[in-house]
């Protein structure tokens, strides 16, 4: 995980573009797509909001591999934090520890990585709703 370029697609790409756009000469909410990607899974998990990827009109915005590699420690921390706190999908602490550490970045973590991505997209939706729509 976090070892290949990441793409937001469809409505989520549009929302990330709006969240990273400058709204005057000096100010913007998030400087980079990566900043949204770091914040979104935490917000999605806290609000228990998951979303599925959609293609929409084909809009796409990317986070390049170099950025992911440079921030891999922070991204892995977020992933592990969510796996450790997610009692809904893994009620036993031993199972959550396995998901966070032993299974991280293995073939057995595919479902957990998909869940993490759903929290990322749900978090993008929440950030957009709270910061852009209500503003």
Show where each model-derived region lies.
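Charged, low-complexity intrinsically disordered terminal regions and linker tails
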Residues: 1-25, 50-135
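Short, basic amphipathic alpha-helical segments that act as recognition/interaction helices
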Residues: 28-55
């Amino acid at each position: 995980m976090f070892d290949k370029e990441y793409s937001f697609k469809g409505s989520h790409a549009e929302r990330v573009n709006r969240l990273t756009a400058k709204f005057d000469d000096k100010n913007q909410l998030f400087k980079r797509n990566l900043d949204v990607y770091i914040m979104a899974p935490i917000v999605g998990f806290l609000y228990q909001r998951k979303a599925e990827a959609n293609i929409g009109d084909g809009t796409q915005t990317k986070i390049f591999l170099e950025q992911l590699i440079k921030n891999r420690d922070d991204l892995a921390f977020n992933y592990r934090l969510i796996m450790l706190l997610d009692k809904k999908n893994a009620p036993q602490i031993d199972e959550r520890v396995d998901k966070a550490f032993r299974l991280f970045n293995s073939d057995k973590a595919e479902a957990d990585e998909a869940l993490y991505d759903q929290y990322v997209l749900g978090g993008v939706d929440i950030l957009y709703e709270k910061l852009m729509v209500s503003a």
